[in-house]
Amino acid sequence: VTSDDMSTRAQDSVRVRRGAAQDAPALIALEQSSFDSDRLSLRQLKHHVRSPSSDVWVAHDGALLGYALVFHASRHRIARLYSIAVAAHARGRGVGRALMAAAIGGARERGAREMRLEVRQSNATAIALYTQLGF
């Protein structure tokens, strides 16, 4: 992951790119279908897409498949994976792994020495991915 216009391949035709304001409605729909609580609002997502202290990564194959939101604390050189979601129909295609590669690469580009994340104990799939990635 080296530039704003990068594309990271997962499987098939899945690509990852930086999010844009026009992605916000689709991101909200994914957010609402993925989480029961602590959902981001449309206003919050639009803010994070534009904010210099966050990165939104979007996986797509012509349609939105998933996203990752990373916050950056440059003074402390720490990145925080705040949220990641993959559409139910896209799970098992490497979308989460591709989003994590973009998130980690983007954090490194910004000088982060560490990335932190939280995950529910009941989310075995995410825990397995994070463990494979060294978290």
What are these regions (language model features)?
Residues R113:
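Short acidic/polar active-site loop segments enriched in Thr and Asp
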Residues A88-R91, L117-I127:
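Conserved beta-strand-loop-alpha-helix junction that forms the acyl-donor binding cleft
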Residues R97, S122-F135:
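Conserved active-site alpha-helix within GNAT-family acetyltransferase domains
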Residues G94:
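Glycine-rich phosphate-binding loop
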Residues V14-V16:
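Extreme N-terminal starter segment of soluble prokaryotic enzymes
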Residues V1-Q11:
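Acyl-donor-binding surface of acyltransferase catalytic domains
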Residues R9, R18-H89, M100-A102, G106, ...:
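Acetyl-CoA-dependent GNAT
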